């Protein structure tokens, strides 16, 4: 009975595979939105103010960071929890493939969240004259919560590895 239960639990890891595939569909949707934004801004690039152009570029950077985060979670999560990727040695291989454990993945995710939050905060500050002080204060508090959380996670990770 114990062996059957253990084998069933071990096999259940494959339930994560469609979830990771779903993330790739999310990446496709993000790429479509990215290029929709590019196509939308290009015809109007000369009519945009510098601040508006910077906001669009920050939005594109934000989407690229989220896309990188999706790829990282999708591939390393699959490798850590489902199955090792069998990639031909003759093909191009990401240098972190097979080296990112769940602890380092958490740190990369935390760093990405801080970077994404920073871009959102910069976007908010660029329009600060039209935003209430309370909203700005809460945005900074939330961002600092992300920063402190990432720092604490890194510190705890360092403590547990030594």
From Swiss-Prot:
Cellular location(s): Cell membrane
**Lipid bilayer topology:** Multi-pass membrane protein
Q: Does the entry feature the keyword Transmembrane, yes or no?
A: yes
Q: Which domain of life is it from?
A: Bacteria
InterPro entries of this UniProt entry? Answer: UPF0114, UPF0114_bac
UniProt entry keywords in alphabetical sequence: Cell membrane, Membrane, Transmembrane, Transmembrane helix
* UniProt keyword annotation of Cell membrane present: yes
> Any S-S bridges, and between which cysteines?
none
The cross-references to Pfam families, in alphabetical order and at most eight, read:
UPF0114 (PF03350)
Main location group: membrane
Tell me its family: Belongs to the UPF0114 family.
Question: What name goes with this protein?
Answer: UPF0114 protein PputGB1_0714
